[in-house]
């Protein structure tokens, strides 16, 4: 009985996911200013409901995440981006 418990058999072998290293696209491309008047660019940082995606998903640095959040909020205030939506993308 002890021998059967130590042998664990899987129907499919367990896969080890190789995660890509996240990088800040602003630092990599040398972007200094995030334009709040460009809603197509800002949509990359929003989910389907219109919420701002967190840093752990987008990979942006803290400095540029703050700038993205400020730009999205300005665009929402000017009605360039919606505050809430069902399906954005």
From Swiss-Prot:
The keyword Aminoacyl-tRNA synthetase does not apply. Pfam families: Ribosomal_S18. The keyword Ribosomal protein applies. GO terms for molecular function: small ribosomal subunit rRNA binding; structural constituent of ribosome. GO terms for biological process: translation. Keywords: Ribonucleoprotein, Ribosomal protein, RNA-binding, rRNA-binding. One of its GO terms (cellular component) is cytosolic small ribosomal subunit. It comes from the Bacteria. PANTHER family: 30S RIBOSOMAL PROTEIN S18, SMALL RIBOSOMAL SUBUNIT PROTEIN BS18M. HAMAP family: Ribosomal_bS18. Binds as a heterodimer with protein bS6 to the central domain of the 16S rRNA, where it helps stabilize the platform of the 30S subunit. Part of the 30S ribosomal subunit. Forms a tight heterodimer with protein bS6. This is Small ribosomal subunit protein bS18. It comes from Parabacteroides distasonis (strain ATCC 8503 / DSM 20701 / CIP 104284 / JCM 5825 / NCTC 11152).
């Amino acid at each position: 009985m002890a021998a059967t418990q130590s042998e664990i058999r899987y129907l499919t072998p367990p896969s080890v996911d190789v995660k890509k290293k996240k990088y800040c696209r602003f630092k990599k491309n040398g972007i200094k200013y995030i334009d709040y008047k460009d809603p197509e660019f800002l949509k990359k940082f929003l989910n389907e409901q219109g919420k701002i995606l967190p840093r752990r998903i987008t990979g942006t640095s803290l400095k540029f995440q703050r700038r993205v959040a400020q730009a999205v909020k300005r665009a929402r205030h000017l009605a360039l981006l919606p505050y809430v939506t069902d399906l954005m993308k």
